[in-house]
């Protein structure tokens, strides 16, 4: 948890979220879409391994030039939706393009897109796009990525990408596509449940 969570204003925001927003969200988890982005690159490799007792583990890891990309997706109670990769870091224009072309077509009237409180996410154009679909943005309290269950899904994606060791952009695309198909409805439900957004 970020050290800033101890600040009075952030602590109060988090308390209000837990006591007022989450109980309401648990009543209709099918309307929730948790959005976030994370980096993926062509140098990802396993960070840990096993070896015989008393022997040092030696592995090869890429060094030098690599390509970093941004992976964006939404997590619903039954699926990982609208996965997308962009070349480079997230920008306001890329975020708006993602919302308009990838995420918005998957939304239904009454859906709530929950996301981090980042400057690039505060786009009037993206908000208007959601409004036309009958959906809206709801920003998490500041410094609170732990309240977004998609972080757990990203952890799984990165673990599989390290195992895949994709060294080209095309290989990275294929690996991410294969990994996105691994998310079962029960697993997605469990992510929401663990974060307090769904009940038994």
Summary of predicted features, one role per range:
Residues 1-200:
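Short functional hotspots at interaction and active-site rims
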């Amino acid at each position: 948890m970020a050290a800033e969570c101890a600040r009075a204003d952030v602590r109060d925001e988090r308390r209000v979220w837990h006591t007022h927003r989450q109980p309401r969200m648990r009543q209709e988890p099918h309307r929730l879409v948790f959005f976030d982005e994370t980096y993926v690159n062509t140098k990802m490799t396993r960070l840990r391994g096993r070896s015989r007792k008393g022997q040092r583990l030696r592995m090869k890891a890429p060094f030098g030039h690599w390509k970093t990309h941004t992976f964006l997706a939404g997590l619903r109670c039954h699926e990982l939706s609208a996965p997308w990769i962009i070349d480079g870091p997230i920008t306001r224009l890329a975020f708006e393009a993602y919302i308009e072309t990838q995420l918005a077509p998957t939304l239904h009237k009454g859906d709530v897109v929950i996301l981090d409180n980042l400057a690039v996410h505060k786009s009037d154009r993206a908000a208007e796009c959601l409004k036309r679909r009958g959906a809206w943005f709801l920003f998490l309290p500041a410094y609170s990525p732990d309240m977004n269950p998609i972080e757990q899904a990203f952890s799984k994606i990165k673990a599989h990408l390290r195992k895949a060791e994709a060294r080209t952009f095309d290989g990275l695309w294929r690996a991410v596509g294969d990994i996105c198909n691994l998310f079962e409805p029960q697993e997605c439900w469990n992510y929401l449940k663990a974060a307090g957004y769904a009940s038994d």
